[in-house]
């Protein structure tokens, strides 16, 4: 259980280390047949990483290396990789707010339960970060241009959308959690991880949700989303979104997410997703660490966090006023590994 309710269970470096160590221990403990990951309180599974701590690290050593932030990313991505490659069944109860690093944990689990209270998002463009924690992997798995849309607009989605785009595997009502836990205890577990994966799959498929799915937001708008996000030219995408003049409140929020987000972040998000499309999971996390470390060494991120979470004026002064003024060669520098960055150290 992620247990810092007052911060919506935001991840710190210490929490990442504890989760990683515990998962590694349980992987070889024959008495552990499956792992369920949840969050304390009713509001959130996990609202992401502690971005204020990352900002402080970025400000302490302008230009880098940013010790706390960069080692946080390295450890967090190792944890994400462990989740994705874990042999035993991993069940995530993704209730309430599931953002950023929280979504990374959810996406890494084979069984991803969402409820009527689930609110998922990757709002990184708002603070000049990027959808990391494997986002370059799972956003690229989605049909059409949904992944690109979520990354560039910071749109929030619900349980129906999560099932539609693959972030959720099962829907249960929030009040069914005790029943799920009781049923897990009663199962006929075996000695092999493969058998126990089947046990969990059959169990989850067998439980009927006690409530209704929320109204879908993505599926009925998929045609517009794909039209907005098609093509290989980010400027054209930006101009299409900016020119849209519909009366759909949800799409208007998405439009504002792109138009008000960091232009520099839009550029590196677009490039990272494109160059990761055919990458392996290992290559995804390696490239995300390079980009994450370089972002920490640039002032754009600290300004984004300042405007949203510190001064809360929601009026960031971005390095570049618009996408047209973002030089390609500047964007390219974010994808060159700094010589003094920490090693990712994924297991062979």
Predicted features along the sequence, with ranges:
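Glycine- (often His-adjacent) and acidic-residue-rich active-site loop
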Residues: 39-78, 128, 334
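Amphipathic alpha-helical blocks and their helix-capping loop/short-beta junctions
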Residues: 173-258
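Hydrophobic/aromatic residues within transmembrane alpha-helices
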Residues: 37, 50, 105-106, 161-162, ...
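Contiguous mid-protein beta-loop-alpha structural module that forms a pocket-lining wall or clamp
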Residues: 134-196
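Conserved CoA-thioester-binding segment of acyl-CoA-metabolizing enzymes
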Residues: 1-38, 81, 347-348
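Substrate-recognition/cap regions that form aromatic- and gly/pro-loop-enriched pockets
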Residues: 235-246, 250-296, 300-302, 306
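C-terminal amphipathic alpha-helical interaction region
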Residues: 291-294, 299, 303-348
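Glycine-rich beta-to-alpha active-site loop
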Residues: 83-127, 149-155, 159, 170
């Amino acid at each position: 259980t992620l247990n810092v309710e007052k911060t919506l269970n935001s991840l710190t470096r210490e929490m990442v280390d504890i989760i990683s160590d515990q998962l590694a221990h349980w992987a070889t403990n024959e008495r552990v047949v499956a792992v369920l990951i949840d969050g304390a309180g009713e509001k959130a599974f996990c609202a992401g990483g502690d971005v204020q701590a990352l900002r402080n690290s970025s400000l302490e050593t302008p230009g880098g290396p940013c010790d706390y932030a960069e080692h946080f990313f390295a450890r967090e991505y190792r944890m994400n990789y462990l989740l994705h490659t874990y042999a035993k069944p991993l069940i995530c109860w993704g209730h309430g707010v599931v953002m950023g690093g929280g979504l990374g944990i959810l996406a890494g689990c084979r069984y991803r339960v969402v409820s009527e209270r689930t609110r998922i998002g990757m709002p990184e463009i708002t603070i000049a970060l990027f959808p990391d924690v494997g986002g370059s992997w799972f956003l690229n798995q989605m049909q059409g241009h949904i992944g690109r849309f979520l990354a560039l607009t910071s749109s929030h989605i619900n349980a129906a959308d999560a099932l539609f785009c693959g972030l959720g595997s099962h829907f249960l009502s929030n009040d069914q959690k005790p029943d799920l836990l009781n049923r897990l205890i009663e199962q006929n577990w075996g000695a092999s991880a493969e058998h126990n994966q089947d046990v969990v799959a059959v169990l989850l498929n067998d439980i009927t949700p006690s409530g209704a799915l929320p109204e879908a937001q993505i599926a009925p708008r998929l045609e517009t989303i794909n039209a907005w996000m098609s093509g290989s030219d980010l400027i054209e995408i930006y101009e299409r979104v900016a020119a849209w003049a519909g009366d759909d409140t949800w799409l208007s929020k998405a439009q504002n997410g792109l138009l008000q987000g960091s232009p520099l972040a839009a550029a590196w998000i677009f490039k990272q997703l494109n160059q990761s499309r055919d990458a392996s999971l290992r290559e995804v996390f390696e490239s995300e660490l390079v980009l994450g470390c370089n972002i920490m060494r640039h002032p754009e991120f600290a300004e984004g966090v300042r405007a949203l979470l510190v001064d809360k004026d929601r009026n960031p002064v971005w390095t570049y006023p618009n996408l047209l003024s973002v030089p390609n060669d500047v964007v390219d520098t974010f994808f060159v590994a700094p010589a003094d960055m920490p090693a990712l150290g994924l297991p062979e």
